[in-house]
C-alpha cells in the first residue's frame, strides 16, 4: 500500500510540474490574444456540453469542462440574460463562426446564416434566481437602448425579464432547494437562516447591488478599451468595501476547486486584472476568501459582453439547502463535494500559481477577440484572489476537509430519509388505490390568465408563477425597504415570501375549500412578519412540508377524490384508477414558441420562431410542460397547444431538460465516483454509491455495455424521478397547500426520460449503451489531454509553490483524503455525460419501449431501503474515527494558536462540526426508525398469516370432531349433519377473501426476494440470539418467516377445503343410500308378505292336472322370489357398506332386515318342499303315459336341467371345455367339432337354398329353417321377455352371460313348449347362439346379444320386436345415441353374417346404417360428422324401420315369409302351372293375368312374354276383389308407359344404404378380450364377410337413386326381379363368394407358407452378407473391429444368459413381439381396406368370364324398367338377380359332413388364385417387415430385406 501511494505521489508531482509549465505558456498566449481582440467579435456565452456549437473551429484546445469536475457546467448565452440586446450584438453573432455540421439540423436557425441560435434554458437555472442587470433598483437609473422593450421602462422599479420568466418561475416552483425559508429539521430537511447567515446574505446582496449599479452606470459611457480596467477596479472596490466591521467577502465563485486557488476560466478575449490587483488579492486575509463555514461563495456571471449597450451580469445568491436553523454561528451551509479532496477550502493555502486537474470553472467565452495586429496580451492571469496565509490556514484546511466529509454524509442522510419517506408513502398509496377503485385524475389543470390578472377562469394552475405576481412582489419589496433595514438576505426573503403569498391568495380564490382543508393546519415555525405596501402585516407563512408530506397530502386528496378538475381536461371514468392512469402511454407536449409578453406571429409558432414587437429576438423555442401557460400578445390571451410525442426537431429541448435536472441533482447531492465496473443490476450499489444523482445513474447505465435490461433502465429512471420528487420539489409547492405541482413535476420528469428513450433509442439498449460508452471514452481522451496541459503549466510555476503543493498533497494522502486520478472517469463528469447524451441524440433511433410500471418499481425501491440503510450506517461508522481524531486535534490546536481571531474561528468550526455530527447521528436514527416502521406492514402481514394458520388448524380440528366420528343413519341425524356442514362451510367462505388476500400479499412479497432456506424458527433464531441482527438480516429473517407461513397456510387451507368437500360428498352419499335402503326394505317386505299369503293358500294336488297347474304357479312364485332374493342381497350389501363406513343404521331397519332374511329362508324351504310334491305327481303321470322322457306334452314344469349329454347319439359324444363350452367328438372318424351333428346337417341343408336368386328371400328362407329347427317359432316374445326379467337380466345389457346361465334361461323357455326334445333343443340353441355371437368359443357373450338373438327368431309382431329392441338400448329418457344404436345394429347384422349373406345387406360396417337412421330422424349432416351428442327417440327409429333399411330388410321378409306359408291363392302359376299357389303369389303389373308362384319367382324362371324388368306385386295373404281390380288398373297404366319412363324412375323395395367407401366403423363389441388375437385367420365367417362385403360394394357401386316405393305398390316391383338364367350352373366353377373364399384359403395356404420360408432364408443370407461387408470395411481399424466384436460377443453372452436363466426377460420379449404382431395386423387391416376395392373389381371381372357372353346378351337385350336388375342398387329382390346372372350360382359353399369343412373345386380358379396371391403377399410382406424391424438390430439389413421382399412379390405377381 505504501509503495502504491509513493508511486502515485511521484507520478502526481511529475504531472503537476508539466501542468504548471503548460499553464504558464497558455496564460501568456491568452494574454497576448486578449490585448488585440476587439470586443465586438465576442460570440457570447455557450452551454458547455453541446458539441462546440459556437466555438471557433480554429481553436486548438477546445476545453468544455475541467477534468474531475463533478458538477454540471452551466454556461448561459448572454442573449438569454439580456433581452435588450442591440443590433451590434446581433452583428457580433453574425460575424462569429457558425456551428459545426453535426449541429446544423439540431439547432433551429433564427435567421442568421452563420450563427447557431442559442438554446433557451429551462427553469432549473440557478442563475435566474437573482435579479438581472435589467432589474435595477428603483433609485438607480439604467441606460437602456431603444431596442429594449418598453415594458422595462414603464414598469418603474423592477421588471421580470422576458427571457427568464418561464425559467425563473419554473425554477422557483420546482426547486425546494433554491432558497428555503422557514421550517425546522424535524419537519423538513430545509432549514431557516439564522441571524449570522442573514447578515452575510445582507452584506453580499448589498455589495452585489452596488457593483451592479456601478456597472450599469458605467456601461453606457465606457468604451471597449477601458472596460477591462473599469471592471477590475469595480471588483477590487467590491472586495474592499466595509461590511459592518467584517472583512469584505470576495467575489463568490460558482465552482469550488479541489486542490488549488480558484481561477475562473476565461476566454482568450477576457481582460485580466492588473498585477496590483492580483497582489492585493493574494495578500487579503483568509477570512475574506471564505464564508462563515469555510466555503467559498458561489460565483455568478463575472463575464460580460463587450457591446456598448450590454450590462454587467448579475451575481446571484448561492443556494444553501442544507443549512441548520438552530446554529447561531453565522455560517452558511454549502453543498457536498463528490470527492474528499475536491473542496475549494482544502487548497486555500496553495500558492497563487498552483493548480491541479480537479479545478472547475463556471463561465467561459467562445468568441475569440483579437486585435488588429493579431498580437497577444502579455499580462499574466491571476490564479487566485487570496494571498498565502500562516500555519493556521493548514489547520483550517484540515478542519474544512473533515467538515466537507461530514457534510457529504449529512447530505446522503437527508437524501435517503426523503427518498425512503416518499417511496414508502407511494407504496402505501398504491395499495390503497387498488382497493378503493376511486376515480382518480392526475391531469394538471391549466389556466388562462389575462394580462389584467382577472380571476374569472377557475382553471387556475398552481404550479405556475405569473409575471404579475413577481411584479407585485418586487413592488412590495421596494416599498418595504423604507420600513426596515434592507439587507440582501431580507430582500431575498421578502421577495420569495411575497411571491408565495401572492400565489397562495390567487390559488385559494380558485381552489375548493376541501382541497385546502387538509393542509391548512401546517404553519411555519418562524416568526418573521412581512410588510407590504398595502397591508401592515402579512399572513403567517405556512410551514414548509417535506416532499413526502406533500406527496402524502396529494395522495390523500386523490383518495378522497378532491383534486380540482378543469373545464377542458378529460374526465376519467369510474373504471379508471391510479394504475390505469400511470400505465397509459406517455405523451410529451408539442414544441411551442413565444415568450412572456411577446406575441406569436403567423406560422412562427409552429416553426419555433418568436416575434417580439415585430422583431425576432433570437430566442429559440423550448418545450413547454403540460401545465405551463403561453402568454400570447398584449391582451393576455393564452394559447394551449395539443399534446403529442416529441419529434426529432425538439430533442435539444429534452436534452436541456436532462441537463437542468442533472444540475439540480448535482447541486443538491453530488455523486460519488462509482467504478465503471459496478454492476448495473444492483439497485443497492447504485443507490449506495451514486445516491440520487441523475449524473451517477446515467454513468451507471452508460458505463456498462451489459446493462441492457429495460427493467433496469426503468428502475434507474423511476429512481431518479423519485429523487426529484423528494429533493427538487419546487419551493412554491412546499409552501402552498396545492398538490398538483408535485404530481405535475413528477409526471413531466418521467415523461421527459421516457420520451427520449422511446424516440431516440436505435436497435436496442446494447447498441445505445455501446455508443454512450464510445462517446464518453472519446471525451475522456480530451479530458486527459487537458490534464496533461495543466500539469505542464504547473511544472513552470516557481519551485516553492510546487514544493508547497506537494506537501499539501502528501498531507491529504496521510489523512486519507487524497483522490486518485484514475477514480474520476469521464463517466462521472457531468459535462462529458451531457456531451455524450447530446451526441447520441444526433443519431436517428428507433423506438425502444420502456415498461411504464412506476408504482411497482417504487415498491421495489422501498424494499431495498433496508440494504441502503445498512450501507449508510456502515459509512457513518467509518467516519467516526476520523471525527474523533479531528475533534481531538482541533482541541489541541486551540491552545497553540496566538491569534484570537484564529482561535475563535477554529472554535466555531469545531462547534459546527460537533453539531453537524450530532445532527447526522440523529438523522441516521430517524432513518432507521422510519425504515423499521416501513417493515411494520410486512410484520403485520406475518402476524396475520400466523393468526390465520392457527384459525385454520382450529377449524380442521373442529371438522375432525364433526365429520370423522360415527354418522347416525336416520334421516333426521343426516339432515342435521348436513346443516352443520353448511354452517361450517359458510364460515370458511366468509374467511376465504381474507385468507386469499394474505396469501396473495405474501406471495408477492416473497416473489421479489431471493430464495432462502425455509428453516424453522429455532434454526433461524439460533445465531441471532447471541448478537445484534442488522437490517439486512432482519429483512432476510422476515422473508423466511413470510415464506414459511405462506406455505403452511396455503397447505392447511387447501387441506381444510378438501376435507370439507369430502365430508359433504360423504353425507350426500349416505343420505342417498339410506333412502334407497329404506325404500328397498319396504318393497322387499311387501313382496315377502305377498309370497307368504300365496304359501298359505297351497293345497295338496287332487289330480295330475291340478298338480301341473300348481307347478306352474310355483314356478311363477319362484321367479318372483328370485327378484326378491336379489333385492335382499342388495340390502345386505348396503348394510355391510354402512357398517364399514361407520354409519349407524337405525335399529328398526336392522330388525326389519333380519326378519326378512329369516322369512326368505323359510319361503325358500317351503317352495323346495312344494316342488318335490308336485314333481312326484308329475313323474307319476309321465310313467303312466309310458313316454321315454325325451318329449314333454305341455307339462310346463321347470324342474331340474336335463342331462345335455344325451343330446347326441353314438358314435358322437358331447364334452365341455373349462369354460363350459360344448364340443362334440366323432369317435368313428376321431375328429372333434364345435357344431352339433344336427347343426352340421342343418347347415348342409341351408346350402341347398343358395339357388334362390334374391338375397333377402334367400336369407329369410334360411332363417326360417333355423327358426323351425330350433323351435323358436313356438316361443312368444312375451314369454322370452318374462324369462329375461325372471332371471335378473333386466338392465344388465352391458354385462356378460355364461353358458350355464344361458342354458337356464333357455330351459325356462323350452319347458313351455309341448312335445319337443328338450335336451336337443337346448344344445342346438346354445350351438346357434355361440356360432352367431361367440365364434371363438370363449364361453361368454353379452346379455344384449343373447336377448337380440332370441327375440329376432322368436314369435311376435314385427313392430313389437322393433319396440323391444329399441328399449334394450334406450337410456332413462327413452332415447338412444349413436353408440347404443350401433351396438343394436351390430348384434342384428350378426345373424345374416353367420349365414354368409351379410354382403348383400351393407356388410358388417354398421356406420352407414346409423347415419341413415339419424338422417331419417331429421338430424343434420354436420351434427353427425361433428360427433356431437345426438340421440333419437322411438318414433324416429320406427319410422326408419318402416322403410325397410337395407341392413335389416331380411327381418320383415322373414315375417312375410312366415305369414305366407299357410296362405293359399286361387290362382294358377303361369310357369309351373301350380294350382292353387301356396305361399307367396307374384302378379305382373304389366302383363295381364300373369301370376307366378313362390318357387318360380325365387329361382328366376321366366316365361315367353314376361320379363324380369316388369313390375311385380307380392301377396302373402289371399287377395280380395278390390285388390284384383286395383292390380288390373295398374297393369293398364303401365301398358302405356315407355321404357324411358321406367329407366328415369327406378324404384326399389327397401331403403338403400350408401355403404361404399364409408367412414370408419362405429364401435363394435368384441365377444371377449381373446377375440382379437387371431380373429381374421381363425374365424372363417369374418374373412368371408370382409371379402363379400367389399365385393358387393364394388359390384353395385354405380347404381341409381334412393327413392322408396309405397307399400301398396309392392307387387308392382316383383316383375323387375324375374329374369331366367340363360344356362345351367357349372359344377366345376365356384357357386358363391363363400366358396371362392374357401377355395382360395385352402389352395394358397401351402404356397404362401413356402414363399414365407423362402423369404426368411433369403433374409438370413442377406444378413450374413451384410455382416461380411461390415467386417471388410472395418478391417482397416482393428481396434474398432475388435471393440465391435467384443461388444457383439458381450451382447451374445448376455442374451445367452437371459435365455438360460432369465425367464422373465424371455417372457417380456415374447410379449413385445406379440404386441408388434398385433400392431402389424392392424396395419394389414388398414391396407386391406384401401386395396380391396381394386382387388375385388378384378375378382368380379374374373368371375364374369365363365358366362360373360350370356350375361352381356341378357343385359343388352333387356329393357331398363323401374327397379331393373341392371341399373339399380342392391335391394330386397334384385340384388341376387344381378349376382346370379354373373356367377350362374350364388350359394354358400357346401360343407363336408365328416369334418365340417367347406367343399370346393380347384378347377377354373387360377385367376382367383392369382388375385388373392397378390393380396396375401402384401399382408405377408407387412408381417415380414414388422418381424424384421423387431428382431433385427441392424437397420440396413431390415431395409434390404424389405426391398428384396417387395421384389419377390412383384415377380410372383408377374
Curated annotation (Swiss-Prot):
Biased amino acid composition, Gly residues: 595-606
Membrane topology of this protein: Peripheral membrane protein
Subcellular localization, as worded in the UniProt entry: Cell membrane, Sarcolemma; Cytoplasm, Cytoskeleton
Binding site for Zn(2+) 1: 1469, 1472, 1493, 1496
Comp. bias regions, Acidic residues: 1815-1826
Spectrin repeat locations: 936-1069, 1072-1176
Residues modified as Phosphoserine: 1564
Tissue note: During embryogenesis and in third instar larvae, expression is seen in pericardial cells of the dorsal vessel and in the ventral nerve cord. Expression is absent from both the embryonic and larval musculature.
Phenotype reported upon loss of the gene: Flies that have reduced expression of all isoforms (due to transgenic RNA interference targeting the common C-terminal region) exhibit severe muscle degeneration in larvae and adult flies. Muscles were either ruptured, absent, or the fibers were detached from their attachment sites at tendon cells. These are necrotic, not apoptotic processes.
Zinc finger feature spans (ZZ-type): 1464-1520
Segments forming domain WW: 1206-1239
The entry's keywords: Actin-binding, Calcium, Cell membrane, Cytoplasm, Cytoskeleton, Membrane, Metal-binding, Phosphoprotein, Repeat, Zinc, Zinc-finger
CDD domains listed in its UniProt record: EFh_DMD_like, SPEC, WW, ZZ_dystrophin
One Gene Ontology cellular component annotation held by this UniProt entry: cell cortex
UniProt region (Disordered), positions on chain: 1-65, 84-161, 240-352, 516-548, 595-650, 716-740, 783-830, 1012-1036, 1179-1209, 1673-1701, 1744-1854
UniProt: Zn(2+) 2 binding residues: 1484, 1487, 1506, 1510
Cysteine pairs bridged by disulfides in the record: none
One of the Pfam families matching this protein, by short name: EF-hand_2
A single MF term (Gene Ontology): structural constituent of muscle
Skewed-composition ranges (Polar residues): 143-157, 331-345, 518-536, 716-727, 815-830, 1682-1694, 1765-1796
Single biological process term from Gene Ontology: regulation of neurotransmitter secretion
Biased composition (Low complexity): 11-37, 84-96, 276-296, 728-740, 783-814, 1827-1845
Stated role: Required for the maintenance of appropriate synaptic retrograde communication and the stabilization of muscle cell architecture or physiology. May play a role in anchoring the cytoskeleton to the plasma membrane.
PANTHER family: DYSTROPHIN-1, E3 UBIQUITIN-PROTEIN LIGASE KCMF1
Quaternary context: Component of the dystrophin associated protein complex (DAPC). Interacts with Dg, via the Dg WW domain binding sites.
Protein name: Dystrophin, isoform D
Encoding gene, per UniProt annotation: Dys
